[in-house]
Amino acid sequence: MNLEVVAQLTALAFIVLSGPLVIALLAFRKGNL
């Protein structure tokens, strides 16, 4: 695998993982307030 493919997969994984994480964080903060 070359570096471009690895970088794209890393970026994609980051976006896919950060989506639900941000939603969970917002829900948690909203629940606290």
From Swiss-Prot:
A cellular component annotation (GO) from this entry: chloroplast thylakoid membrane
The organism's place on the tree of life at top rank: Eukaryota
Membrane topology: Single-pass membrane protein
Pfam families from the UniProt entry: PSII_Ycf12
Transmembrane spans: 8-28
Chief location category: plastid
Function description: A core subunit of photosystem II (PSII), probably helps stabilize the reaction center.
Subunit: PSII is composed of 1 copy each of membrane proteins PsbA, PsbB, PsbC, PsbD, PsbE, PsbF, PsbH, PsbI, PsbJ, PsbK, PsbL, PsbM, PsbT, PsbX, PsbY, PsbZ, Psb30/Ycf12, peripheral proteins of the oxygen-evolving complex and a large number of cofactors. It forms dimeric complexes.
Name of the molecule in the record: Photosystem II reaction center protein Psb30
Organism name: Staurastrum punctulatum
Organism lineage: Eukaryota, Viridiplantae, Streptophyta, Zygnematophyceae, Zygnematophycidae
Gene this chain is encoded by: psb30
